[in-house]
Amino acid sequence: GGCSLQHLSYDGQLEFKRNQVEETMKRIGKLNVEVPETLGMENPWRYRNKSQVPVGFVNGKLTAGFYQKRSHAIIDMSTCLIHNEQGDFAVQKTREILAKYGTEPYDEQTGKGDIRHIMTRFAHTTGQLMIVLVTTKERMPFKEEIVRELVEQLELTSIVQNINPHKTNVIFGDRTKTLWGKDIIEDTIHGIRFAISARSFYQVNPIQTEVLYQQAIDAAELTGEETVIDAYCGIGSISLCLAKKAKHVYGVEIVDQAIQDARANAELNELANTTFETGKAEEVIPAWYKAGIVADVLVVDPPRKGCDEKLLETILAMKPKKVVYVSCNPGTLARDMKILTDGGYVAKKVQPVDMFPMTTHIEAVTVLHLN
């Protein structure tokens, strides 16, 4: 599994993460900023709203669990203490039902078999639960019987099939169909409703997502008069939380399906003061700038590799009053902050947030003010 800090007390984990951020700011960014205590969870267990569990044969029996470290050998798993209970229970029941009907797990070596992964998604605020069966082909022996038993034995909102016929380590294929119930489940963050499909990007720790986004909302200090640009906006989760308090929010994201989800979520919440566009942030934002769209507040929530150099150049040319940076990698955060501070911005503090207790992952939020 991925719980490589589980041997530390939870207070020890939070301090470890704070030290990591502080040390990285000094070493890579040459920045002397305040790094307060990591914002952790009251209960750091059972927080994950999504599980993706590979299925295989172990000792001639169908099983589902984790990959052994540095291999694709499956270790049988009866429970995972960071998965929410509903999803955990659903994985076990699904595994039992698949075994009962003699479903053949996918074999990476031969390319044969029917079932590749069991995935669950749970909506923290509504209690809605989705099961996704990732199969090698659309036809699967006893599919109707398996679906019927899942519905009888679990409290479900949705059962979805994803078809992935390719010899690949990528979990999902291109085709998805709903076998029972709704196409989506619905959750809320800061009172904003989100429709989540099998393949939607959505933060996996709903409790700490609210903590993380509150840091970003507080840092933005919106009055209702500001134009906000959200680079790397995903399905619009930060954008829509900010749209309640901004004049207009523009979001950009490279994944077209995420932009379609963002637009649908804006409509779901009747937030007409939003514009979402598919494309690279480093290409779309300069085009907006040329068209006269200038941000008062610019929000970035980039992938682990950090912000593209061209985007940082555009920020320095556009000169928004504030840059709110939400980071999942202290190293690239420190690097990008160094570029922005060399270009006239000032940062006083970097706030670590523990989104993934028991793991080494660290999220952090900072605000850079134009000097």
Regions found by a protein language model. Name each.
Residues 56, 120, 127-136, 193-197, ...:
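Short, aliphatic-rich beta-strand segments
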Residues 46-52, 61-63, 115-119, 128-130, ...:
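Broad gene-expression machinery/nucleic-acid interaction feature
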Residues 142-153, 157-371:
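Rossmann-like S-adenosyl-L-methionine
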Residues 55-57, 122-124, 354, 370:
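Short, low-complexity Ser/Thr-rich regulatory SLiMs
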Residues 65-68, 132-134, 262:
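Short, acidic/hydrophobic/Gly-rich beta-strand patch recurrent on exposed beta strands
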Residues 1-105, 125, 140:
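Extended interfacial segments that mediate partner engagement and assembly in macromolecular machines
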Residues 37-44, 108-109, 116-121, 352-355:
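Short, solvent-exposed loop/turn elements at beta->coil junctions and helix N-caps
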Residues 104-112, 228:
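Short helix/loop segment immediately N-terminal to the Walker
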